[in-house]
Amino acid sequence: MGRVRTKTVKKSSRQVIEKYYSRMTLDFHTNKKILEEVAIIPSKRLRNKIAGFSTHLMKRIQKGPVRGISLKLQEEERERRMDFVPDESAIKTDEIKVDKETLEMLASLGMSDTPGISAVEPQQAMAPIAAFGGGRAPRRY
């Protein structure tokens, strides 16, 4: 079973990653040396825990955005995705295929002359598959 990480370890490693993301790597020993240089951590054991969690978070960041860590790269990527406008609309309304009943409903509403609506024969539903048991007699308990 894994160990529980304290709030101190989690908060401090998130802060270190936000400030020194460009220097952090996926290697524990490198991250430990970076922490030694950039932060004043009272004990070796706490430094190792923070370095370990920072390494863990760096691996998660490689896979995708991580909650609680705001990186400039991720913010720019999110902005780019939000501002994206597709060349062609995903909702094409050039032609709408409807069945006879729907056409009648549109006619009753006075919308039968709407452009792009065409009638299509409804597809037949498949016959239901035999019930459980494959046609055998019911179980006797």
Curated annotation (Swiss-Prot):
InterPro entries: Ribosomal_eS17, Ribosomal_eS17_CS, Ribosomal_eS17_sf. GO terms for molecular function: mRNA binding; structural constituent of ribosome. GO terms for cellular component: plasma membrane; ribonucleoprotein complex; ribosome. GO terms for biological process: translation. Pfam families: Ribosomal_S17e. Keywords: Ribonucleoprotein, Ribosomal protein. The keyword Signal does not apply. Belongs to the eukaryotic ribosomal protein eS17 family. HAMAP family: Ribosomal_eS17 (MF_00511). This is Small ribosomal subunit protein eS17w. It comes from Arabidopsis thaliana (Mouse-ear cress). The gene is RPS17D.
